[in-house]
């Protein structure tokens, strides 16, 4: 099983890394799942030069920036479409900003890939698009962990009886 960790990266204080770093060991060690963390994989399909400079190109060379980010978009969406078994999206606050998150949720939804949305904010403050793309909604990472542990424990038991 491959879990894709989805959520704001670009405009967050920690680059969207902290929650992912806390959750990934549970997914790997407790569930035995593989994890793709786009916040940690900065190289993706980029050259060393692109990885090192694409952020500065946003203000100095917009065409080069677009070409590079389009490679990232293709890489991430291809991974979701062709390899991910489920997405976990963490939306930290009503002030969060992200362009890629909604696209990733939409691709997963259209492909029938389960989307687990975790957000501590009131449901009326969550984008309707994001809610519609999600299959399960959680108010905490701990609630998600309980759900996943139960969900995949049943799957492991089913495999034992085959």
Language-model features: where?
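Conserved catalytic or regulatory cores that recognize and/or transform ribose-phosphate-containing ligands
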Residues: 1-162
């Amino acid at each position: 099983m491959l879990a894709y960790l989805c959520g704001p990266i670009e405009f967050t204080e920690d680059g969207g890394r902290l929650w992912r770093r806390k959750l990934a060991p549970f997914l790997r060690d407790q569930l035995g799942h593989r994890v793709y963390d786009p916040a940690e994989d900065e190289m993706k399909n980029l050259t060393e030069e692109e990885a090192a400079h694409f952020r500065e190109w946003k203000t100095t060379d917009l065409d080069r920036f677009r070409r590079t980010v389009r490679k990232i978009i293709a890489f991430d969406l291809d991974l979701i479409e062709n390899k991910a078994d489920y997405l976990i999206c963490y939306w930290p606050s009503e002030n969060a900003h992200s362009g890629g998150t909604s696209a990733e949720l939409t691709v997963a939804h259209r492909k029938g890939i389960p989307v687990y949305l975790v957000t501590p904010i009131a449901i009326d403050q969550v984008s309707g698009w994001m809610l519609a793309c999600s299959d399960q909604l959680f108010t905490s990472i701990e609630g998600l962990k309980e759900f996943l542990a139960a969900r995949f424990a049943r799957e492991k038991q089913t495999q034992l009886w085959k």
